[in-house]
């Protein structure tokens, strides 16, 4: 498109970068990639919400590749709605990672070998879709260290669980071995 090519040289070449110009004739936002364009829109939304839409040019990109949070704490668990709001917050603030690993999720930890019940699997799919819509990579984490046996059977159990999560549309994964003792902490095996 000729209108985008006109600004191509002004767009930062760093991943997730964008160029934005606000002038008397309108606003131009051009992203290095899809996420860069999304971030430019977030900057414009922020400026409008603060009533600060003034003539300007912005060339912006992240200095840190991974920006976000791990939900992997002990304590009062987040509700599904809270998780959705967190993902919205991450997207608005140009964070690109949300790692789902709450200690209260039994299928992430104590019952890691078992499949999620259908209703809970749908909630994870919803989180994953929302994250994608907000420019956030959704990582599903598994925490098998409490009772993993360093056997071919448990290796297969782990692979099978990850494949089930892949079947839900999830494409990024983490394997946690923190806060454990016993067999799971014996990495030499």
How would you describe each model-predicted region?
Residues 70-189:
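Aromatic-lined carbohydrate-binding surfaces of glycoside hydrolases
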């Amino acid at each position: 498109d000729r209108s985008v090519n006109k600004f191509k040289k002004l767009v930062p070449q760093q991943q997730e970068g964008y160029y934005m110009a606000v002038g008397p004739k309108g606003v131009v936002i051009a992203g290095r990639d899809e996420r860069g364009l999304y971030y430019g829109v977030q900057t414009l939304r922020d400026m409008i919400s603060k009533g600060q839409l003034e003539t300007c040019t912005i060339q912006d990109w992240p200095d840190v590749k991974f920006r976000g949070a791990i939900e992997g704490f002990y304590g009062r668990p987040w509700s599904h709605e809270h998780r959705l709001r967190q993902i919205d917050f991450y997207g608005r603030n140009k964070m690109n990672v949300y790692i789902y690993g709450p200690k209260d999720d039994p299928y992430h930890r104590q019952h890691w070998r078992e499949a999620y019940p259908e209703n809970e699997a749908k909630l994870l799919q919803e989180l994953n879709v929302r994250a994608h819509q907000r420019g956030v990579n959704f990582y599903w984490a598994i925490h098998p260290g409490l009772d993993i046996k360093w056997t071919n059977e448990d290796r297969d159990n782990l692979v099978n669980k990850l494949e089930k999560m892949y079947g839900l549309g999830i494409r990024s994964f983490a394997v946690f071995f923190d806060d454990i003792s016993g067999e799971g902490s014996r990495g030499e095996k």
